[in-house]
Amino acid sequence: MKFLIKKIYIILFLLSILLIESKIFAKESEIQYTKENISNYFSGIISINQNYNNKAFKHLKKVKSLKNKHSRFNIEFIRTLILLEKFEQAFAFSKSVWTDDELFFEIDLLLGLDYFIKKDYTNAEKHFERLNKAARYNPFFDDIIGDVLIAWSEASQGNKENSLKYLEKIRKPYLHLKKIQNIFLQCYFNDSHTQKSFEELIHNNDYNFSRYNFFLTNYLLFNNKIMEAKKVIKNSRKEYNSNLLIKQTENFFLNNENEKIKNFFNCKNPNDSLAEFFYVIANLYSSEKDYKLSNFYMKISLFLNNKFLPNKALLAENYYYQKKNKLSKNIYQSIKSIGPVYSWYASKSIATILLDVKGKKYSIRSLENEFNLLSNPNFEHYYELANFYKDNEYYEKSIKYYS
């Protein structure tokens, strides 16, 4: 791999010499294709492909003079800014390169979101409409993103009929996304059918909607239906025993921490519903192993709703598969504050990272220490620690915890 990168640099260096000496590039008065600019540009692209976002930003920001001449630079720079959570810089840069006669999905997406957050819905919709025209740059989701965003722009202005009209445009195979957003719109507009729609969704066998037991619970709590909310979680725990969000919600109820459930999400805030929409997109890209694009949408989701900390688990998982162990470990460490369910899950995940980085002994010691800190370990804790011992060939210890 190192040999390949070195070879690429040599080729790029030779290319840069040719470009500098070219009369064609010499005539360009607005931009200078110097050896340093070309080197920084290609170093930035290589860093992006290797998932080194900070390094990519360092190189690309040195060649911002390319922005008016090199459209690919604009896209890569904007994506890098988002991955580094530099949203204000991303908004400003997008404004500086936007033109009416060019369609760039990421630029119109960010400008539309910026206007939407500032409640300038006319300008927001102008950019969201352009997303549909630029769908060829984002074929995985066709024009669904533009339609959902316009639906919420219309909803934010009190136009229920118009908002539902845009959702109706969504076709197969994205009907599951349409159903989710339709229910959130019902909730936003105080529709009396909201609870029934949630119940139909979570019992739908065409798709795994187990996650939305949490959102039904959240909705019931906001409507002071506490006993019904507890019943939803109790029933869903039986059916979806391994779902972290449901398990943690049950734990919140057991400790009378109902407000924590409400703090994650509020259907009266359009930003929260859009954050869930982008989370689902990020999840779909992750399932396709496109972790870079998944992270891009995940960062947007967290920007819109930074209260929904459980969603960070997807980001940590993506980083792990990208072999960005330090970033993954840091995020797992941060989600421990959510509650004991996520804390134990994070501890197991960190132990797995340490297994790759420092070996069995260090990894097992780490998980043992976390286990010993548990105030009231249950059957699942013992069973999962025993499994970890077994998987790492500590058979005698595993037998002890199995029994």
Regions found by a protein language model. Name each.
Residues 73, 107, 141, 146, ...:
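TPR alpha-solenoid repeat register
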Residues 57, 61, 87-99, 123-135, ...:
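Alpha-helical repeat scaffolds
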Residues 36, 70, 104, 138, ...:
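Residue-level recognition of tetratricopeptide repeat
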Residues 33, 67, 101, 135, ...:
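A structural motif in tetratricopeptide-repeat
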Residues 49, 83, 117, 156, ...:
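Register position in tetratricopeptide repeats
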Residues 21-77, 83, 91-92, 102-103, ...:
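N-terminal leader/linker segments that initiate helical-solenoid repeat arrays
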